[in-house]
Each structure stands twice: as structure tokens, then as C-alpha cells.
Amino acid sequence: MKEMEVRAFKDDIKKYKGKSVAVFVYEGDLKPLARLSKGTSNKAKRVAELENFKGKEGEILKVPTLGTSVDFVYIVGLGKKEKVGEDTYRRASANLVKRMRRDKVESTVVVIPRRGDVSKEITKAITEGAILGNYRFDKYKSKKEDEKFEIKEVLINRGDEEGIRLGKIFAEAQNYARNLVNEPGNVINPITLAEEAKKLAEEFGLECKVYDEKQIQEMGMMALYSVGKGSATPPRFIHLIYKPSGKPKEKIALVGKGLTFDSGGLNIKPGDYMRTMKMDKSGACAVLGIMRAIAQLKPDVEVHGLIGAAENMPDGNAYRPDDVIKAKNGKYIEIDNTDAEGRVTLADVLSYASELKPDKIIDMATLTGACMVALGEYTAGLFTNAPDFAEEIKKTAKRTGERVWELPMDDERLRKKIKNTVADVLNTGGRYGGAITAAMFLEEFVGEGIKWVHLDIAGPAWSKEEYGYYTKGGTGFGVRTCLEYIMKVSSNV
């Protein structure tokens, strides 16, 4: 399958001769149509008025314009002008590409409402939207839908070349993560995930260290080992490293939860809750996607990608409720429930990350159903020990369209819930405030003086529906926000 091309069209749009043009318009404003040739513009405007097209976000009208320089015009609504941001363009571009696929249209050129050159940021957003919107996971379909049809190109009128380059890298990294999330547990397990990391490192010039179950025990990572020891496929610890050529402006550690499948262990999940648990590796897949892009972007930031990969299965050798396990940083964990395994694996990975003495740690984990209860399926919970760092991540997430919402960690009454134990810390905190007590558990394993943000991506890591630039399945949530933030640190913006 040939990949869809996204590139700039630098000429006056009136000179374009092709199948279609896509004009993005604000709600109630069809003036951008006047940028087309007079005949095309008049036909498109007349039909839009007859069809009562408003230009609301998500609206797309296809107008036949045979006899002019193009066969038809897509009029794509952006919504109210004052509410339009980068993510509006990203969503509009994705919706356009999905409509093109439905109509079997191979190419188009995008025209935005503003005159003149398109900014790097908006070009990047349109590029990302097109590539993300064109994503499909049909690897396991013996007969593919639209097997003989592929969109060939999306052109951006007066688009910025650097914006296109960045948009491609960001979106392809997210799609790479989506592919990994969507792979089932019989394909991606701890060993094959580690092999994928090594393959990625070799292809993109990263350093990669993989530790097997024996080495994991020797390193004192008994929490990670314990979660994975009930599976026929033993755990792996993965460490990917990117170092810039000069002195790094910062050192950032990215930590991803890598449960390649979560049955719940001895506290086994009911069947309905076990379905889709291949997505419990979403944090790890996001880290791999980010590292893929970092190797191409080459920021002046040292970046470490850290993944604890395990499969949580019931077995005669599986860890049990009441077990007490010593984590890498020397703290003892009492197991209350084996289905609260993600935080147990992350205890060791965060401890290892802290030993690297980074300036900042960002962890991403499909950690708690409680976070979904609190925030819904589309928003990640954000938890932190550093308010200034959290604000930067929140600002970045607003630009990328990856919704996050900060939840509090200052109630010591909740913290006591994970201290009611024979050990240093308990792996559950009771029914209420579960996302917060899980984050408080993780904080126990973050080193002194290190700024840390935890993203509970249990909701937005997986989509049950198609919307915007997402299809059903893995979303690759967190990839673009982390990349955007790292590039911001690199450029000192």
C-alpha cells in the first residue's frame, strides 16, 4: 500500500487543475470561496446557499463544479471563528480525508480562510489530521475494504514545508503507537514488545537495552517480576536512549505501562472486562512512538524511554493477594488485589527512572477505571508533584487536542488509605478516589527533587467509536503532547 502524500501547493489556487478543492470556512462566512476561479466560486456558493450550509464544525458539503477547473469542491466547516484553534484544523482535515475515502477521491488541495502563507502550526495540524484520519488497522482482514482504492495526496495551498515535515513525523509516530496497541496478546507479548523496541532502535539510531527475567530479578525489580511471573511469557524491562550531539538542555524520562494483556491475575476479571485488555500496553506503545519521532526530530534534550513489559495471568506461580514484594527502591508493597498490577510494575520502572537523575519524569498508564468514572472516556487524568510542570503539560495538551484534567493529590486522608498495611504501601486505596490513591502510590517511587507528571490514560487510550481523527481501537494518546513538550524544551520557547 502506497502511503498518502501531504505536500504544499505554492501557486495561486486559481491555477490548480485537479479532481477537487477543499475550502475550509468559518461558520456563516463563505467568503473564502471567492479565492477560487470565478466560475467555480459562483457555483459552490450558490449550492451552499441552496443547501443552507452553515459552516458548523464537522459539516462538509460536496458541490459538483463540472465545467470549471475542478470537478467538485468540498466546503469544510470550522465552526465559529473565535473558537477555532489548531485542533479544529486537525479535526477538519481528518474529517475531510474520511469523506474523501468514502467518495473514493484520490486527491485534493486544502484552502484555509486566512489569506497568505499558512503558518507552520496550522500546516502541521492539517498534516497531522490528514494522516491520522486516513489510519486503518486492517492487517487481519483477508479481504480489505476498498482494497483497490487509496488516497494519493492532500495538498495544502501555500502550506509551510517545515510544518508538513513535523506533522508527518508526529502523526506517523502516533499511528505507529496505534498499530502496536491494536495488536492482540498472542502477537505482542513482553518478549515480542522488547524485540519491537530493538528493531525500532536499530532502524532509527537509538540505544536500546533489554533485560530478561533473570536480569530483572538481579536488578531488584521484584515488583515487575512478580506481576509477570504467572505468565508463560516472562517479563522484560526495556530502556531506549536518545542523546543529542551537544550538551542537553534537560534530561527527561518517559515511563510507559506495558501490560501486553491483563486478565486480572488471580483476582481475575469478568469476561466483559477482560475484552480489549490488549490495550493495557498503551502507555508503553506511546513511549515507543515518541522515541521513534525523537530519533528523527533530534531535539537538544536527552530522552529515556522506559517500559516494564509483563502479562498478568493466573497460574500456580502467579503473585497473590497478601503477598509482600520489595520494589527496586527498597520499599515494600503489600498486594491487596492482583488486578491493580499496573502500579506495581510502574513502581520499579519509576524507581529505575529516578536513578537516572532526570530533570523530569512523565509516566503514561492505562491505570484506573476510577479515572474514567471521574473524567469520562475522552480525558486523561493528570497528577503531579510539580505545579509548574503540570501547567506546561496542560498548555501543550490544549494545543495538541489531547485532553487532560488535573486531579488533586493534597488530601492526606486519601494517602492514609494506601498506608493501611503491614508493609510500606498497599496497592489499592479503597473504592473512592481510586485514580488519586493510585497516583499517590506511584509517587512513593519517584526520587526526591524530580519533577513528575503522571497521566492516567485509561479512558482516551482506547476509542469505542470513530470521531475526529480517531477510529475505533487504539488512539496513541499522549504521543503528540509529549513530543510537543520535548520540542518546546529543546527550543526554549
From Swiss-Prot:
Q: Which reaction does it catalyse?
A: Release of an N-terminal amino acid, Xaa-|-Yaa-, in which Xaa is preferably Leu, but may be other amino acids including Pro although not Arg or Lys, and Yaa may be Pro. Amino acid amides and methyl esters are also readily hydrolyzed, but rates on arylamides are exceedingly low; Release of an N-terminal amino acid, preferentially leucine, but not glutamic or aspartic acids
- What are the boundaries of the signal sequence? none
Record's SUPFAM superfamilies? Macro domain-like, Zn-dependent exopeptidases
**Xref: Gene3D superfamilies:** Leucine Aminopeptidase, subunit E, domain 1, Zn peptidases
Which compartment or compartments is the protein found in? Cytoplasm
Q: Which residues bind Mn(2+) 1?
A: D262, D339, E341
Q: Which cofactor does it need?
A: Mn(2+)
Keywords for the protein's UniProt record, in alphabetical order: Aminopeptidase, Cytoplasm, Hydrolase, Manganese, Metal-binding, Protease
> What does the record's cofactor remark say about binding?
Binds 2 manganese ions per subunit.
Give the E.C. number(s).
3.4.11.1, 3.4.11.10
Q: Which residues bind Mn(2+) 2?
A: K257, D262, D280, E341
Please give the InterPro entries that the UniProt record associates with this protein.
Leucine_aapep/pepB, Macro_dom-like, Peptidase_M17_C, Peptidase_M17_leu_NH2_pept, Peptidase_M17_N
**One BP term from GO:** proteolysis
State the PROSITE patterns in the record.
CYTOSOL_AP
Q: Which GO terms describe its cellular component?
A: cytoplasm
The job of this chain, per UniProt, is described as: Presumably involved in the processing and regular turnover of intracellular proteins. Catalyzes the removal of unsubstituted N-terminal amino acids from various peptides.
Indicate the family of this protein. Answer: Belongs to the peptidase M17 family.
Question: Per its record, how is this protein called by name?
Answer: Probable cytosol aminopeptidase
Origin organism is: Aquifex aeolicus (strain VF5)
